[in-house]
């Protein structure tokens, strides 16, 4: 015998959907703890549902996370659930193009706020965690947005200035309001050389 519980939701001004991920995207918070966090902020939570799969060991979300139009964690091969301004829902496969332009090159960013692999450039924001959580050596570049407080809004370009280039042996701290572009020492040599060519003050 199987029992199913469900909630019937009709969009209205008094009831609206909220996407929550805790204090950062690898927090591994439960639905209950996220609901409590929202209620501490003055919201009244009527219902909640687990919205993504994640890697148990790291908390790395497998899917896309976007709140307030800001890309918190990227993914472009899994279906995603989204909500329009009127509260209605849409389900589909996102088609993200993530690029970094520097030194005359337009280079694909492998992922944003995902555990780094050797597959290319990764970009981290303070939505990810306090550090990059990298466990192997690589190169990390601290980037400051030229417009203070600018975030990774979907469909926009963010211009940054290089603050530091680090030959990192492991995790690098992610400064509040800034970004870390990262590549593994096991990635392609040309990609490593390209990021190592960056200097403090470059944009």
What are these regions (language model features)?
Residues 1-185, 194:
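Zymogen propeptides
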Residues 188-189:
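Signal that preferentially marks extracellular ectodomain short beta-strand elements
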Residues 195-203:
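Loop/turn positions that initiate beta-strands
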